Amino acid sequence: MQTVNIHEAKTHLSRLVEEAAKGNVFIIAKAGKPMVKVLPLS
């Protein structure tokens, strides 16, 4: 499972959404602390 920092997530949100839609799960971290898990709905 990939972890991205919040700045990278804001910069590349469209790409991350596309990756999640393909089934890739990842974590968004702030200051090195995991905050949320992003995963596809289906």
Label the predicted regions.
Residues 25-42:
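Short, charge-rich, low-complexity interaction segments located
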Residues 15-18, 41:
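Generic detector of low-complexity/intrinsically disordered segments
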Residues 7, 18, 27-29:
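N-terminal cationic amphipathic segment used for targeting or macromolecule association
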Residues 1-16:
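Bateman/CBS regulatory modules and CBS-like beta-alpha motifs in cytosolic regions of diverse proteins
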Residues 20-22:
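Short, small/polar residue-rich loop motifs at catalytic or cofactor-binding pockets
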